[in-house]
From Swiss-Prot:
This is Sec-independent protein translocase protein TatC. Part of the twin-arginine translocation (Tat) system that transports large folded proteins containing a characteristic twin-arginine motif in their signal peptide across membranes. Forms a complex with TatA. Keywords: Cell inner membrane, Cell membrane, Membrane, Protein transport, Translocation, Transmembrane, Transmembrane helix, Transport. Pfam families: TatC. It comes from Blattabacterium sp. subsp. Periplaneta americana (strain BPLAN) (Periplaneta americana symbiotic bacterium). The lineage of its organism: Bacteria, Pseudomonadati, Bacteroidota, Flavobacteriia, Flavobacteriales. The chain crosses the membrane at residues 28-48, 93-113, 134-154, 183-203, 221-241, 242-262.
Length: 266
């Protein structure tokens, strides 16, 4: 049996949606203000972390490089901090506002999804609600996992590749502030959304736009695409490619299991 909220007139649905949107925007504004009041922590310790030689990922892979008999100067190690420059009068202020705004969205994303779920939940049947239990926790977990993967794995690889790639020994690589911050924020947000792939598969299977046999049949093709994607976003050696590829393959395989579970319950 569906909730009587389904019988609400159209404009009452719009009013209900407006309420959830206001709550989401308020949460995002609060998160943005919190980030703005912690500028030093956000920029010096978090966003500029991958630009420093002592970043945890570089230290970890430097040690792994020694274990696997690489040279003393590990492929994942910088000899000095990266040079980042700002060339616009209001560049730092614009970056400050834009970064805190995007960061506010990332920080409040679980709550925003919660508000979205509260809006659509009354339209679900009791059986659909039963199989959707824990969806908020799962979305939050996968999104945070993707954000961490983007920050600690993807960002260092991309930055290292951009810093070490040379067309000639003549030009120096000095990063532009806006390009650097955009790379960090884009990597974090895109990986957070990418890790929600199993959730998308769940709903696509529920509405029968995709099926378990289809995902299983084209698994090898999907893995090949993931391999190409991982190779494109990593420096080029096999080890870094595998590090990025494995989580993507696990996500796809997990999505197959989810599709099978949903299909079986129908």
């Amino acid at each position: 049996m569906k909730n009587e909220k389904n019988e609400m007139p159209f404009w009452e649905h719009i009013e209900e949606l407006r309420k959830h949107l206001i709550h989401s925007v308020c949460a995002m504004i609060i998160a943005t203000i919190i980030l703005m009041n912690n500028k030093n922590v956000i920029f010096d310790y978090i966003l500029f972390g991958p630009a420093k030689t002592d970043f945890i990922t570089y230290r970890l892979f430097h040690k792994l490089g020694k274990i696997f008999h690489r040279s003393h100067h590990s492929f994942y190690f910088f000899s000095h901090n990266l040079e980042i420059q700002n060339r616009q009068i209001f560049g730092q202020f614009n970056i400050y506002v834009w970064t805190c705004f995007i960061g506010g969205f990332i920080l409040s994303f679980p709550y925003i999804f919660y508000e979205f779920w509260k809006f659509i939940k009354p339209a679900l049947s009791d059986e659909e609600r039963k199989y959707s239990r824990g969806i908020i926790m799962m979305v939050t977990f996968l999104f945070i996992l993707g954000v961490l993967f983007g920050y600690f794995i993807l960002c260092p690889f991309l930055i290292h590749f951009g810093y070490t790639f040379r067309i000639s020994s003549f030009p120096r690589n000095i990063f532009d502030l806006s390009d650097y911050i955009s790379l960090i924020m884009h990597s974090i947000l895109s990986m957070g959304i990418t890790f929600l792939f199993p959730i998308f598969i769940y709903f696509l299977t529920k509405i029968e736009l995709i099926s378990y046999p289809f995902l299983k049949k084209y698994r090898k093709h999907a893995f090949l695409i993931l391999l190409i994607l991982a190779s494109a976003i990593t420096p080029g050696d096999i080890f870094s490619t595998i590090v990025v590829l494995i989580p993507l393959m696990i996500l796809y395989q997990f999505s197959i299991y989810i599709s099978f579970y949903v299909s079986k319950k129908k």
